């Protein structure tokens, strides 16, 4: 399941805001004859309606399973190992983060998308195993522009907002943007020594 919010910025101002909620579940049914069938369904978060959908799906699996061929390679663990891992949602305050972003973009032409949300995954089987994992994070993918319409692309993603980390990334981007604002120099054909950042070298290797 996913619950996330997003905000689109343009010229340092909030232009659009929205949210996304998605819930899906996969049912897997097996028998002693090594037959197995799966089905994935979308749920809407309404308990009675979702239960009805899951019961119909389970009945479908029970009806179709006997007609399937056996899978001689089918194996599954019979040991039970239950776990529960949950992150602290309070470490992310969308309003506080956006207020700081808007303040930092006061004199900048900033364009980007801020998104934050929760991911939930769980597993349960007829042997009694229960596994649950929830995680919370945010991502701010953005670019800053100068008057020549040159841009520097930046990203800050984490599970906990840190003002110093964000400011460091932004200030480094501003420094690079200032360099792009310098007068252009035409380089004639010839042999030159060139320094490539690790990220630039990685892109070249990926193209090979």
Language-model-detected regions and their locations in the chain:
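Acidic low-complexity segments
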Residues: 1-6, 51-133, 164-202
